[in-house]
């Protein structure tokens, strides 16, 4: 297995379907030009905003999954700048799940953020996604906030989590 930092083009080519599934699930219409343009723009803008996509591949080059995070290291000489990072999205192709690969990717994110001056890492997950919450809790993240109704008034919302690096 190889872990590399993907550029935007490679990320879109290899993980577009995973991102669409994470962000919009079955609400995404593959025939709707507005949907396609919106996703591509959202990915592009996110890459422009100091994000990094760490992507895992098999030795044969088959995509496994990714952790996409933002760490703005800030202005040189400004003490509070660059101390936090945020996981934007992460996902593994189903056949590669529950093999320790997600943990390896998360550890690599933590190491990179810390080596670049980061002191803490945040993430958020849908409250109904117990597997995701347990993944992070088992790896040292602490739930710190609940934002109900984030995806609509009848939605359970997001749980925000924090880990000191």
Give the predicted meaning of each segment.
Residues 102, 106, 129-132, 149-155:
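Short glycine/proline-centered loop/turn elements that form peptide/ligand docking sites
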Residues 6-89, 93-95:
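Acetyl-CoA-dependent GNAT
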């Amino acid at each position: 297995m190889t872990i590399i930092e993907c550029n935007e083009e490679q990320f879109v080519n290899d993980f577009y379907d995973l991102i669409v599934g994470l962000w919009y699930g079955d609400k995404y219409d593959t025939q709707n030009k507005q949907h396609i343009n919106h996703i591509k723009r959202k990915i592009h803008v996110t890459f422009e905003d100091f994000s990094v996509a760490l992507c895992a591949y098999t030795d044969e080059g088959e995509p496994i999954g990714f952790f996409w995070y933002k760490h703005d290291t800030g202005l040189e000489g400004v003490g509070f700048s660059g101390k936090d990072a945020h996981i934007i999205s992460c996902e593994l192709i189903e056949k590669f799940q529950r093999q320790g690969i997600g943990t390896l990717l998360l550890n690599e994110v933590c190491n990179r953020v810390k080596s670049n001056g980061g002191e803490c890492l945040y993430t958020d997950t849908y409250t109904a996604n117990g597997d995701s919450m347990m993944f992070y809790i088992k790896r040292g993240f602490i739930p710190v906030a609940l934002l109900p109704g984030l995806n609509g008034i009848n939605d359970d919302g997001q749980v925000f989590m924090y880990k000191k690096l």
